[in-house]
């Protein structure tokens, strides 16, 4: 696999340029089956730039949120959203992955695994000891993906937005020398 470079967008960044929003919308629109499961867009088969801009603004309105844009050979292949802390549970010490989408035309190429490894390495290097995420119970493919990466179920509860049943998974983050290979020498940050 070619090198993956990850750019980040934080709440402090200015509005995203139109061309970048169009690229991000392409990733979102290519994940129709996922959006049919989530119901996050009114028509999962017709996701538009203003809808994605609003979704990203909503994600970035949460303190400590970051949008990660993964590129391979200049092409946007995946988008992820992370949170430094759970927005409704101040006692939870772990950061969270709120979203990881791989472009539909680039699935099964290792990009999701590489981006997940990059996110884990980023938080590990920041001194965090665990990483969590929630998967809709109806998304069995995502549940299998995350469990294959070493995430284990730790809770079951409704999500914050719509009350949909979710499995909460957690992965222990290895020390700075352990687990570095999984982060992928191909994943870097610009």
Task: Name these PLM-found stretches.
Residues 132-136, 147, 152-168:
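Conserved catalytic-core motifs of GNAT/GCN5-like acyltransferases
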Residues 123-134:
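Conserved GNAT acetyl-CoA-binding A-motif
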Residues 5-107, 116-118, 122, 173-174, ...:
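Acetyl-CoA-dependent GNAT
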Residues 102, 136-137:
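Short amphipathic helical patch at the helix-1/turn junction of helix-turn-helix
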Residues 142:
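Helix-turn-helix
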């Amino acid at each position: 696999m070619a090198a993956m470079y990850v750019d980040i967008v934080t709440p402090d960044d200015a509005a995203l340029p139109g061309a970048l929003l169009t690229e991000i919308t392409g990733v979102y629109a290519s994940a129709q089956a996922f959006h049919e499961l989530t119901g996050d867009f009114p028509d999962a088969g017709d996701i538009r730039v203003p809808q994605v801009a609003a979704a990203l603004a909503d994600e970035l309105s949460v303190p400590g949120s970051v949008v990660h844009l993964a590129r391979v050979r200049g092409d946007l292949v995946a988008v992820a959203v992370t949170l430094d802390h759970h927005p409704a549970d101040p006692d939870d010490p772990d950061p969270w992955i709120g979203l990881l989408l791989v472009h539909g035309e680039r699935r099964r190429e290792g990009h999701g695994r590489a981006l997940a490894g990059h996110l884990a390495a980023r938080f590990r290097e920041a001194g965090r000891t665990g990483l969590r995420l929630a998967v809709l119970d109806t998304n069995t493919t995502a549940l299998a993906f995350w469990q294959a990466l070493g995430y284990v179920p730790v809770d079951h509860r409704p999500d914050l937005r719509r009350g949909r049943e979710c499995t909460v998974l957690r992965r222990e983050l290895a020390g700075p020398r352990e687990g570095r290979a999984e982060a992928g020498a191909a994943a870097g940050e610009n």
